[in-house]
C-alpha cells in the first residue's frame, strides 16, 4: 500500500503557478478531489441517466475495506496578471481512477420439497479517465467590468462485471465517452448616467458513445447502444 503527495510552486511579479500530484492505492480520491474551482455545478448527462453504471452487490462494509483502488490526480493552477486590472486564471486537471474487487454471495431458500441454493461470484473492474480545463478572464477596470469563464470536462469510462452464478459464467461490459463544455460571459459598463449589463451562458453536453454488452455462455451476445447531446 502506498500514497504519494507532491506539490511545486512558481512565483513571479505577474505570474503564479501551483502544481500538485497525488497517487495511491489505499482509498479512492481522484474523482472527488478533482474539483472544478470556477464551476462547482455537477453535471449528469442524459446518457448517464439512461444507461447508468453496471454494478454488483457489494459487501456490507465500507468501500475502502474491500475495494482495491489505483488513483492518480494531477493539477496545475495558474494566475497571470496581463495588465493592471486584467487577470487570467486557469486550472488544468487530470484524474484517473481504477477500482476492482472480488465478492461471493450464497443464498439458500427453503420450500416444502427442497432447498434452492443460489451461489454468485462477482469480480467488478472499472477505470475512468477524466481530463478537465477551466479558464477565467477578468477585466475589472474603473469604467468597465468583463468576465468570461470557459470550462470543459471529459469522461472516459470502461467497466466490466464478470459474474458466475451456480457454475454459469457471464460478463457485462460498459463503455462510455462523454464531454461537457460551458462558457459564461458577463460585462457591465457605465455610459453617461446609465449602467448597462450583458450576460450570456452557453453549455453543450455530448455523449458520442454509450455501450453495454452482455456475454453469456449459452446465448448470443446482447448489445445496447446509446448516444446523446444537449444544449
Could you tell me what each predicted segment is?
Residues 160-164, 212-214:
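Short, tandemly repeated low-complexity microdomains enriched for cysteine and small residues
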Residues 102-103, 210-231:
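Short, intrinsically disordered, charge-balanced linker/junction segments flanking boundaries
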Residues 1-158, 172-206:
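Membrane-proximal, glycine/serine-rich, low-complexity loop/turn segments characteristic
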Residues 108-117, 165-170, 216-223:
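Flexible, solvent-exposed loop segments that connect beta-strands
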